[in-house]
Amino acid sequence: LSLPQNFSLDNFAEAMRVTDFWHSLGNSIIITAATIILSLVIHSMAGYAIGRNMSRKKGFKLVYFYIVSGMFVPFAILMMPLVKQTANLGLDNMAGVIILYTVFYMPMNVMLYSGYMKNVPMAMEEAADMDGASAWRTYWTIIFPMMKPMHATVAVLTALGTWNDVMTPLVIMSGSDNITLPLAQLNFQTQFG
């Protein structure tokens, strides 16, 4: 083994050309950013509602366990029915993958948000209620900003899972225009060994 005779970046340029690197990178960024935004909004609202009401109302505990039980279902079991359903609904594109990721990460994120909400005191919400704020305004102006540490945790976990996933875009999206960066790297798995 020795160093190469001539230093060259041609291999990197060829790799970027073969994978359509910039287009794949853009697709990955769009899918990841949209999934994070939808997850933060939808999952935080669900976690807030469940976390605040689980100890007081029996129905919320059942909903919580129903949602969290989704963590025990592996993707391999859901893969073939999802391919058929997304194709029938016309969601075999980036929008379909974003929706699926948002649903896939819901059990974990709702569990995190509801656990966080159990430890947040009710005093701020009660004060907003006394001032005449609606539940919607209380959530967006008081509760949502108070959940910043959990937003950061959910954003990082969702981003890592979305960015590194190969299987979901591979089986859901059709056409080479929609490939993500991890999916584009599959070209090299069989091409060079």
Per-region residue spans from a language model:
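A structural signal for multi-pass alpha-helical bundles of membrane permease subunits
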Residues: L1-G193
